[in-house]
């Protein structure tokens, strides 16, 4: 084995030299130079500095403006709440541990940080699944006259939380475990060992299949059918130009969110899968650290995409920041009236 396994950790370095120590008790500067740990701390500070204001602002503006409280926006706000969980439950912890060079909060702190990081990522993924299904049902119309209403949105939010908990909670109760990963300053699911006493192998397979592959398959199925339907509708002029434009803009925004999610999380999932399927292989701490920390940037992109691509929200945000007045004088009257076929109650205004 090219790593050192302890009771609650796995350090990606052989202990033949005798330098490996518990990441809960000693600085891990034998894994990487101290400046690299400082760089990780600075990176996490940047994510906190950007992630908290932009997510909190998105949440606050939506609460302040009643016209933004549409059913589809409930799902988008669910993404924001997931991001805030990651910022408070994960980023602050990881920044402090990186500053110290090891996981100073101990095993319990590792479980808490790993839980919030996993929960936030899974809520985001399952929220994107709900958005994809909503877009598919609304645009492709497999069920005629379906209207995505408030009850559907609430069920979608509840579903995303149930599925996320089904992924993040089992390690807390003995099915798999959370351990430090990479440079040992952040925690995640144990992909490094089979650990038969906690049935780790079965959990990792369950997680990859149920909480990664299946959601992505649903998303790709929905958008694959959706793209074909939009092209066909445009060719046959089945909907009004305004309706087609609104549906395309909403769909484009959600697709960009999906692409951003894949960019952030697929490298991490790929590396984790490689490590799991190549037990004992030789890899350095940086190999897992870079994709793990890159995945954390996902807490920023959803609200940014929402702000950039939603003109109605931008106007509301400017009005809120300017104490009730929009200096640009660009109140989007059409945004509040955007008509999307069979789904006027779930509208998200186009940019």
From Swiss-Prot:
Its main location: membrane. It is a multi-pass membrane protein. Residues 1-36, 97-110, 174-202, 275-286 are extracellular. A motif ('Ionic lock' involved in activated form stabilization) lies at residues 134-136. Contains one covalently linked retinal chromophore. Upon light absorption, the covalently bound 11-cis-retinal is converted to all-trans-retinal. After hydrolysis of the Schiff base and release of the covalently bound all-trans-retinal, active rhodopsin is regenerated by binding of a fresh molecule of 11-cis-retinal. Residues 62-73, 134-152, 225-252, 309-351 are cytoplasmic. It comes from the Eukaryota. Belongs to the G-protein coupled receptor 1 family. Opsin subfamily. This is Rhodopsin. It comes from Gallus gallus.
């Amino acid at each position: 084995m090219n790593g050192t396994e302890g009771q609650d950790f796995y350090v990606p370095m052989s202990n033949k030299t005798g330098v490996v120590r518990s990441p809960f008790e000693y600085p891990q500067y034998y894994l990487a130079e101290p400046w690299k740990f400082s760089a990780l701390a600075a990176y996490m500070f940047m994510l906190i500095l950007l992630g908290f204001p932009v997510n909190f602002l998105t949440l606050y503006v939506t609460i302040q403006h009643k016209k933004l409280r549409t059913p589809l926006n409930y799902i988008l706000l669910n993404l924001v709440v997931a991001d805030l969980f990651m910022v408070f439950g994960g980023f602050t912890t990881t920044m402090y541990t990186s500053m110290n060079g090891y996981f100073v909060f101990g095993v319990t702190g590792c479980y808490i940080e790993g839980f919030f990081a996993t929960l936030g990522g899974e809520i985001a993924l399952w929220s994107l699944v709900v958005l994809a299904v909503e877009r598919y049902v609304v645009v492709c119309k497999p069920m005629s006259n379906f209207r995505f209403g408030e009850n559907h949105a609430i069920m979608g939010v509840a579903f995303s939380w149930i599925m996320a908990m089904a992924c993040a909670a089992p390690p807390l109760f003995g099915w798999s475990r959370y351990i430090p990963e990479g440079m040992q300053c952040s925690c995640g699911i144990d992909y490094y060992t089979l650990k038969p006493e906690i049935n780790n192998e079965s959990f990792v397979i369950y997680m990859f299949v149920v909480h990664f592959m299946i959601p992505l398959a649903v998303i790709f199925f929905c958008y694959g059918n959706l793209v074909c339907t939009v092209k066909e509708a445009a060719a046959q002029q089945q909907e009004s130009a305004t309706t087609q434009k609104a549906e395309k803009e909403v769909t484009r925004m959600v697709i960009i969110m999906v692409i951003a999610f894949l960019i952030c999380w697929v490298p991490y999932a790929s590396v984790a899968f490689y490590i799991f399927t190549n037990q004992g292989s030789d890899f350095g701490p940086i190999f897992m650290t870079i994709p793990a920390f890159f995945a954390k940037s996902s807490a920023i992109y959803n609200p940014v995409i929402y702000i950039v691509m939603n003109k109605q929200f931008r106007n509301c945000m400017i009005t809120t920041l300017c104490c009730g007045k929009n200096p640009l004088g660009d109140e989007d009257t059409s945004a509040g009236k955007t008509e999307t076929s069979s789904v006027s109650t779930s509208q998200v205004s186009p940019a």
